[in-house]
Amino acid sequence: MQLSPQEKDKLLIFTAALVAERRRARGLKLNYPEAVAYISAAILEGAREGRSVEELMSYGTTLLGKDDVMEGVPEMIHEVQIEATFPDGTKLVTVHNPIRLSVVPLVGSSQV
């Protein structure tokens, strides 16, 4: 199988994300590389499904909370950037502060 460097990178991300997903399912807290891979893979899949850049930027902040990761990890990840393939081409998706330190209720929601 002949893969381009970009395809190899995506396979590496998905492999790390699979490990992270399994560890999270067992109740283990994710470390830095696992958290980044978990978020990146979700963004790549969302792009493949046809979601917009704006949707994915927002979605990326809902995937993990501070209770899902090891101590110090939220402060280490200021942003996650991933080049994703959309139906209309490749675009860079940036998720700022992907792991929220506290949950802020959405305006107009019933969450308090």
Curated annotation (Swiss-Prot):
It catalyses: urea + 2 H2O + H(+) = hydrogencarbonate + 2 NH4(+). Its EC number is 3.5.1.5. One of its GO terms (cellular component) is cytoplasm. It holds the Pfam family Urease_gamma. One of its GO terms (biological process) is urea catabolic process. It comes from the Bacteria. Coiled coil: none annotated. InterPro entries: Urease_gamma, Urease_gamma/gamma-beta_su, Urease_gamma_sf, Urease_subunit. NCBIfam families: PRK13241.1 (NF009712), urease_gam (TIGR00193). Belongs to the urease gamma subunit family. HAMAP family: Urease_gamma. This is Urease subunit gamma. It comes from Gloeothece citriformis (strain PCC 7424) (Cyanothece sp. (strain PCC 7424)).
